Amino acid sequence: MHLASPKNDLSTHIQDVVNVIKFEQLKSVVLIGHSYGGAVISGVANQIPDEISQLIYLDSSLLEDGETFFSVMPEEIEHYIRRANEDGNGWLIPVDWEEGEASGDVPHQLATLTSKITLDNPKRLKIPSTYWLFADGEPAEKDERYRFIERAKDLKWRTQVFSWDHNPQKNRPEELAKELFKVIAVQAKGRSGKPEN
């Protein structure tokens, strides 16, 4: 697993992406963050906002300055810590295969969920951003990530609710790609419009 170590946390993953963008001298980058990846792209945008043209959050965590994944989703703490202690030497959360997870899944480092994010650059809030909630056929208000789409609305971001499950990149990749290209094109043309509900 890339960068797997008990010492590596959220800041490690953020810096890894920042380094790639800087080394490759990339401009107008569109960052897409799924699930935990939402925290990563927020952190990247905080460090190098001028290189980022869009942020797209897919059913992801949407942290504020000083928060951790566990602080905004406390219902997950016991499960993940137990899994890490039982089968991950106390620091690595094993893949849960019970629901037919894809073979490409990898263990997750516990420290990434307990480390605080730094979001102190106001320029990141000027980046056109989109938040999609995947409600899995249920009312959006009942979804555990509904709090994040509410945050996105408060920030005047484009938002949309899909009936998909948490992992459309596995179950409906063509539909997901089509919708992503659509929103990227709209933002690129500067037609921000009103946030969708």
Predicted segments — roles?
Residues M1-V30, N46-Q47, V72-P74:
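Active-site loop/oxyanion-hole signature of alpha/beta-hydrolase fold enzymes
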Residues S11-V18, P173-F181:
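Short, amphipathic alpha-helical "lid/cap" segments that border enzyme active or binding sites
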Residues I32-G33, G37, I41:
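Gly/Ala-rich beta-loop-alpha elbow adjacent to hydrolase catalytic centers
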Residues N46-I52, I56-W91, T112, A140-R147, ...:
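Flexible "cap/lid" loop of the alpha/beta hydrolase fold
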Residues S103-P122, D143-E144:
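Active-site nucleophile elbow and catalytic-triad environment of alpha/beta-hydrolase enzymes
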Residues I127-L133, T159:
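Catalytic His-Asp charge-relay segment
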Residues D136-S163, K170-R172, E179-V183:
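Conserved loop-alpha-helix segment in the C-terminal half of the alpha/beta-hydrolase fold
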